[in-house]
Amino acid sequence: MKVLIHGTGVMSSILKEVIEKEGELEISGFADDFTNEKGDMIIDFSHFSRLPAMIDYSIKNNIPMVICTTGYDETMLAKIVEASTHVPIVLSSNTCIGINLMNEIVSKIAPQLRNFDIEIIETHHNRKVDSPSGTAKSLFNVINDALDNEMFLVSGRNGLHVRDKKEIGMHSVRGGSVVGDHSVIFYGDDEIIEIKHSSTSRRIFANGAIKAAKFLVGKKPGLYRMKEVLA
């Protein structure tokens, strides 16, 4: 399978290194913008501003996509969803196995802890510009879905604020070279349950993206998630 790597940043470089070392896939393009590159799959670790051009290129050339970029808005998400009617797409803010298992865990225990206060804390390196992280947003979404979409998000806190039982607090920390830490904390009366995942290397994201690319081979157009990739 020939892979087009969209983006030339740190994650794209790590993905390139992993693919070359693995030897199963062939890199046919490594760029921020595609012109005449041909390939069987696009793996995207770019910037949300570059997504529209990539999506248009994908549809024009009928190339499936693994989209790992975060920070896009609802308008961009709608474009991705529309594109999935033309080509198969895996959309994931975090392709590592551990985080996707964490999503499953918190979605299962949240209904049993309805009376607990829920907080999400995410920590990343000092070069990450978007906050909260796409992974933290995904954690909120799976918890909210499990709680009948009754919850609402509060990003950080400032000033006088009485906590509502229906709110989930979201907090972003930026510093140093942290690859990515995510915690979901359930605060009850006299007990605390914390589910935490720490990433110690970016290679886990590259490995997950490769797994997603292999999953898409032969798939019909549609929007797929890592839950389906790992099933």
Curated annotation (Swiss-Prot):
(S)-2,3,4,5-tetrahydrodipicolinate binds at H125, G134, T135. The keyword Electron transport does not apply. Its main location: cytoplasm. It holds the Pfam family DapB_C. It is found in: Cytoplasm. NAD(+) binds at D33, C68, T69, T70, S92, S93, N94, T95. The keyword ATP-binding does not apply. SUPFAM superfamilies: Glyceraldehyde-3-phosphate dehydrogenase-like, C-terminal domain, NAD(P)-binding Rossmann-fold domains. It catalyses: (S)-2,3,4,5-tetrahydrodipicolinate + NAD(+) + H2O = (2S,4S)-4-hydroxy-2,3,4,5-tetrahydrodipicolinate + NADH + H(+); (S)-2,3,4,5-tetrahydrodipicolinate + NADP(+) + H2O = (2S,4S)-4-hydroxy-2,3,4,5-tetrahydrodipicolinate + NADPH + H(+). It comes from the Bacteria. Its EC number is 1.17.1.8. The active site is at H124, K128. GO terms for cellular component: cytosol. Pathway: Amino-acid biosynthesis; L-lysine biosynthesis via DAP pathway; (S)-tetrahydrodipicolinate from L-aspartate: step 4/4. InterPro entries: DapB_C (IPR022663), DapB_N (IPR000846), DapB_N_CS (IPR022664), DHDPR_bac (IPR023940), NAD(P)-bd_dom_sf (IPR036291). GO terms for biological process: diaminopimelate biosynthetic process; lysine biosynthetic process via diaminopimelate. Keywords: Amino-acid biosynthesis, Cytoplasm, Diaminopimelate biosynthesis, Lysine biosynthesis, NAD, NADP, Oxidoreductase. GO terms for molecular function: 4-hydroxy-tetrahydrodipicolinate reductase; NAD binding; NADP binding; oxidoreductase activity, acting on CH or CH2 groups, NAD or NADP as acceptor. HAMAP family: DapB. Catalyzes the conversion of 4-hydroxy-tetrahydrodipicolinate (HTPA) to tetrahydrodipicolinate. Belongs to the DapB family. This is 4-hydroxy-tetrahydrodipicolinate reductase. It comes from Brachyspira hyodysenteriae (strain ATCC 49526 / WA1). The lineage of its organism: Bacteria, Pseudomonadati, Spirochaetota, Spirochaetia, Brachyspirales.
